């Protein structure tokens, strides 16, 4: 299978997000990379599902709470930026304070 660098990045994000989902389901608090991967993958999927940029940005703030992550993680993630594929093309999505 031949993948472009962007496709490899997306696959890596998805894999890390899947691991984060499993750990969260077991009741573990997520660390920084797990939280970023979970939010990033969810944003990419929401865009692919046809949501608008504004909807994806808002959705990004509803995925995790402070109770879901280790202490200090929300402060380490002031914003998340991801290039997501929407029905009308690729756009940069920025979510400010994704873990309120």
Swiss-Prot record:
Keyword Membrane on entry: no
Enzyme category, top tier: hydrolase
Assigned EC number: 3.5.1.5
An annotated GO BP: urea catabolic process
GO cellular component: cytoplasm
GO molecular function: nickel cation binding; urease activity
Swiss-Prot/TrEMBL catalytic activity: urea + 2 H2O + H(+) = hydrogencarbonate + 2 NH4(+)
Biological pathway: Nitrogen metabolism; urea degradation; CO(2) and NH(3) from urea (urease route): step 1/1
Matching CDD domains: Urease_gamma (cd00390)
Pfam families: Urease_gamma
Family (UniProt): Belongs to the urease gamma subunit family.
Subunit structure: Heterotrimer of UreA (gamma), UreB (beta) and UreC (alpha) subunits. Three heterotrimers associate to form the active enzyme.
Protein name as catalogued: Urease subunit gamma
Organism encoding this protein: Paraburkholderia phymatum (strain DSM 17167 / CIP 108236 / LMG 21445 / STM815)
